[in-house]
From Swiss-Prot:
PROSITE patterns: IF_ROD_1, IF_ROD_2. This is Keratin, type I cytoskeletal 14. Residues 47-93 are annotated as: Interaction with Type I keratins and keratin filaments. Residues 47-69 are annotated as: Disordered.
Length: 93
């Protein structure tokens, strides 16, 4: 009947709304994490620049830096997290 179809559509819309909210939350968290990494990288770049300027009158010295990249995968199905995986890769420049 029409009423059953309407109820089914409402249920599906509510489920999609919940999935949207979860995905929006994940997106917001990832954007915050990206902003944090950008600030860290900018701070690292500023630190390296000031180290190079201050070492101009000294004998040459090695400046080494490293970078850490964290990749996080979150698989959400029907509004539930079904799989998460995190990988950290460190590189020396």
């Amino acid at each position: 009947s029409v009423e059953e179809q309407l109820a089914q559509l409402r249920c599906e819309m509510e489920q999609q709304n919940q999935e949207y909210k979860i995905l929006l939350d994940v997106k917001t968290r990832l954007e915050q994490e990206i902003a944090t990494y950008r600030r860290l990288l900018e701070g690292e770049d500023a630190h390296l620049s000031s180290s190079q300027f201050s070492s101009g009158s000294q004998s040459s010295r090695d400046v080494s830096s490293s970078r850490q990249v964290r990749t996080k995968v979150v698989d959400v199905h029907d509004g539930k997290v079904v799989f998460t995986h995190e990988q950290i890769v460190r590189t020396k420049n």
